[in-house]
Every structure is written in structure tokens, then in C-alpha cells.
Amino acid sequence: MGRLFGTDGIRGVANVDLTPTIAYDLGRAVGHLLEASGRRVVIGQDTRRSGDMLVAAVSAGLASVGADAIQLGVVTTPCLAHAAAGGEFAAGIMVSASHNPAEDNGLKVLSGGRKIDDEVEEKLERLLFQAESLPGVSNRELGRITRESAPIEAYRASLIAEAGDLLQGRRIAIDCANGSASAIAPDLLRELGATVTVLGGTPDGTNINLDSGSTQPAALAAAVVAGGLEMGMAFDGDADRLIAVDDRGSIVDGDGVMGICALARLAAGTLRNRILVTTVMSNGGLDHAISEAGGRVIRTPVGDRHVFEAMERADASLGGEQSGHVIFRDVANTGDGILTAIQLLKALRDTGATLAEGASQIRLLPQVVINSAVRHRDQWEVDPEFAVAVAEADARLGARGRILVRPSGTEPKIRIMVEGEDADEINQIARELSELARARLN
């Protein structure tokens, strides 16, 4: 059996790749890794139909080895992380496939409010592969399976305290992607004083991320313009990402959001060590804007876990990804779409700028990313024709741009990013490489 864990936990088509047996075995493995019966593990899920099945299975696995499973129901991943960071729980398990389609699902393990590191993940995977042989406990030592809501209320209270009166009187639109955000964001933002137009707020178990959310913000942009609203905020299925839309309908991605927040903090002297941490996918224009303001950018491999680890090493307070995962380490240990929206509003308030004005400070280079569906996503470097084509295209761009090719860690796709000064040239290169990838890697 190959590796189960990808860049963001275990993912696959529910009941096909990701079965109740795998979820049960993961529960047993997590319980054994805790090395103590009676430990409490908190579990959350997004709105997918398969979530109930997988939560039941992972809960049973935990209970079978003496760990208590505390189910929260439908919550955001940041809500689960907040609960897991509080010291009341030994670990957290989130049942979600984030931005993936409804037929997929996933399992993410958190400890101390953050995703587990590579070393813990490897230990967990070894235990998972031998889960059937792991000893159980006696009837008297079985764990309990219960439902609690107090951790959700504690998370809501933390957001309310962080926001203060920031949203009072604002007219905004949000897209909850028919996912976890629909359970908290509309009511919370209204409680904070905003007038809220809600898109993607009617989950039915099969429509999560369907033509909505942070990966498809076109409908949100149209709603903002049509309603004459101040801005829009798009979350993904488990609400750990934020993509913003300004009053003119222009998209402000994670690079723009990070840039606005970093520049505001640099101006105020509150960006710790004057460092912004982001990944190799982020636009080169972000580096230029931060450098001009007296800061510097540290790059990491793709994945918010890598970002957080680099933030710890550099003692940085702000980092994230172009996709909208943004980590404010002085407040939380993981990306949080709702918290990011609050921090973005703080940055705009502190600088007196609109979202469009804030985003205009960062001159992003033309960049195109194409996700090509391929069966053999890990073979791009060893396929001679494709590898040569990438090298030749990179040489063609020279110092005027860059090419990044990487397999998706969560889907059967290869991501091709081309960045440069000439939009027509980079689009042509990206199309050529994408067509070749589909021909050679399928």
C-alpha cells in the first residue's frame, strides 16, 4: 500500500478511496499514538453527505482503544483547530476535503491547534497500516462518544472579541461555498453589525464548492457589483481560506490579502521581524512590494503546514498562500477564512484605504495557473518529452519570468504556473505545456 497522507491529510472519493474502514483504522491509530486511554479527541466535519459516515467510523475507532470522541457536528476547520489548541483535547480530527468536489472527503489530524508535522504523520501512517493488529481495551475501558457545542461557542466568542466594531454598518456579500462557513459566518457577521448578502449558504450534502466559494468567485463578484456593496468574501468548503472581491468586482487573492495586511503591519511596526512567509506559488510582485516597504519574503514549498513551520523558524507573525490560506500566528496556528476577513478589515481601517486601493499597492506580475487532469501526476519530471519542454520554455523566459510545475497533493492533477512580464507569452507557454501534459501523462 502506498502513502495515504498527502499535502493536507488523507483524501479521496468517499466510500471508494476513503472508506469507513480507513476512518476506523485512523481513529485506532490516533488513539494509540496518544499512548493513554481516556484521552479526549475532538471531531468536526464539513457539509458533505459522507461526513456522518466517516465521523461515526473514526469515533468508533477512537472508542475501541479507550479514547473519548467528542463530536462537534458541522464546523469549520479553524473552529476545530481552536478547540484542539485549548488544552482540553489531546487532538482534533477534521473530516473534510476542503475545496474538493462533494464526492470527495478527507481526514486531517491536528495537535495543539495545528496540522501534525511530517514526523508525527509518518508515525501515524505506520500505526494505521497495522491498525488491525493494535490491541483494543476491555469493555470497562472503552471510550465514550458524545456531542458538545461549548467549543463552537468559545470559537465564536474569540472571533467577536477580535472583530470589535469593525463590521458595524458595513454592507458586504459572502460566499460560504455551501460548506462549513454557512453554519457560522452569516449569523456571526450580522451579529457584528454588518448587512450581509449570502451566497452558497444552503448546503444539501452534495453541493459543497459547486460553482461557488473561493475557487469560483465569479458569482460573488457579480453580486457585489449588482448590489453596490463594499466588498465580498469567499470561503472554501471548510472555511480555512479567504478570497476577497472589491467594490468593482475585481478578485483579490491570497497574495493580495497577505500583501495588504503585511504592508499595514510594516507601516505600523507590528510585522514581526519584518517578514512575510509564503510559498513558491505566490506572485513575484508580492516580493517587490514587501521589499520596497522595508520587509522581506521567505518562500516555502506549497502547503500551509510548510508555511507555518517556516513562520516558527523565522519567528514571523504573518504568512500564507496565494490560494487564500493566511495564518496570523499571533492569533491562531492555522489558516482561518473568517479571521482573515477580520484582519483584512483591520488593515484597511488602519491605512484608511478601500480594498481596491489596498490591492493597488501590490503590482502583481502576469501569472497563469492551469490545472491539468492527468493519471500519472508524479511522472512529469521523468517523462523525457515533457521535461525537455519545460526546460526549453523556462530558458525562453530567462530572467523575464519563471515556470513552476508540481503535482497536486490532493487531486489527480498537475499544476502548471507560468509568470512573466508578457501576459500573451506566458498564456501561450502555459497552454502548450498543459496540452503536452495531458498527452504525455495520461
Name what the model sees in each region.
Residues 38-46, 70, 171-174, 274-280, ...:
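Short glycine-rich phosphate-binding loop at a beta-alpha junction
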Residues 13, 105-227:
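Gly/Ser/Thr-enriched, mixed-charge loops and adjacent short helices
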Residues 231, 268-442:
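Phosphate-binding and adjacent anionic-ligand microenvironments
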